[in-house]
Amino acid sequence: YKNSSPMVRAYYMDDRWCRAEEPITCPPVAHAPVHWRLRGVDGPQPADWKDPMGKGAGPGVSFANEMFRLTGVPQGLICCAHGGTTMAQWDPKLKKDGDNSLYGAMLNRVKRNGGFVSGMIWYQGCSDAKEETIPLFRQNMIRFVKALRRDFRFPGMPFVQVQIARLIYTDATSDKNWTCIREIQRTLQNSIRNLLTVPAIDLELDDGIHLSGKSQIILGRR
């Protein structure tokens, strides 16, 4: 997916603004230590590092292009994600650890860009699809969104979450667990105001879990 618009930009994880191009999220080059420690390494890769597998895509650039098309307002994406993480790893209580925590690193990235955001798009939940974490997921999400709105000083901040997709080559327990997370996500709007949930269950996969690049474009436009 190519972004031809200079009005859609991204603040990449190596702390530079540039026209948004996938992959906009690249933890190996991140300056925040939490991102390399989660990968088990001691420092970031050079800024020009490329995934040797040539993979990496998300709905962010497609989403921003669609927002620009609909509103005419230039879009800026502040990239903070790290794949395969749990809500416990995003615990707002860890913000005191600054760039050594996912939540703290996210806050610092926003602060470096004026401290204000117009909203958040969120794609997480697969790593919490386990019997021991499913019972905690709803309350963890409620606390997370509440903390975000408090720390960004934006009580009504729009929060758009992706409902996790399906998975293949799995056992009955895993399928049940993913279904439980999807159902919690579907009903979160009853507990969190100004939260929207976007489905992904009907989109094609690139492997047993991950959406294809084509699906990410469709998802972003939704």
Indicate residue ranges for each PLM-predicted region:
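Cell-envelope and extracellular/periplasmic
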Residues: 1-222
